[in-house]
């Protein structure tokens, strides 16, 4: 075998090894079930594993696994929701729950009102729109409703309000 042929064979072998190594590295970079579960059940405003977040956003398979897990955990969820607005109120239906965004006047922040006639109220809301996500604690219910201020000074609350107005936003009530 000539030197040129041997060198060409070595280049092809090295390329195949690198390609296989990258494929194996990508598969091993996917978070396991326990890491996805820990991320799905985390407290709002708690620490997050950035490697898990990166995998959820960049790998479609991991993103689907995570959203499936959230859907199983959720009291109600809507992968896509139809939103209706008369200019002052935005309403969404998510399972047995009704979400309304009430625009406030006189400089007050808009309010998210979550109502249900079911007995159990969710504790957390998580919304997904494209590669953005917002997760907030809903607090305690009062007379079958939860009210959350979507204060523009609070980045997560403002992001949630903007996302909920988009019909393509996925909503999980946990």
Can you say where each PLM-predicted feature lies in the sequence?
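C-terminal, beta-strand-rich globular interaction domains
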Residues: 89-174
């Amino acid at each position: 075998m000539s030197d040129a042929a041997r060198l060409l064979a070595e280049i092809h072998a090295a390329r195949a090894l690198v390609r296989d190594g990258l494929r194996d590295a990508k598969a091993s970079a996917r978070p396991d079930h326990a890491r996805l579960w820990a991320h799905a059940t985390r407290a709002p405003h708690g620490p997050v594993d950035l490697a898990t977040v990166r995998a959820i956003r960049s790998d479609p398979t991991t993103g689907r696994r995570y959203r499936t897990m959230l859907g199983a955990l959720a009291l109600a969820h809507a992968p896509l929701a139809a939103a209706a607005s008369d200019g002052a109120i935005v309403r969404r239906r998510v399972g047995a729950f009704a979400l309304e965004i009430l625009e406030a006047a006189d400089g007050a922040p808009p309010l998210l009102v979550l109502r249900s006639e079911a007995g159990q109220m969710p504790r957390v809301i998580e919304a997904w729109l494209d590669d953005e996500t917002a997760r907030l604690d809903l607090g305690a219910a009062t007379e079958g409703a939860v009210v959350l201020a979507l204060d523009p000074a609070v980045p997560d609350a403002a992001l949630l309000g903007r996302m909920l107005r988009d019909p393509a936003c996925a909503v999980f009530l946990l």
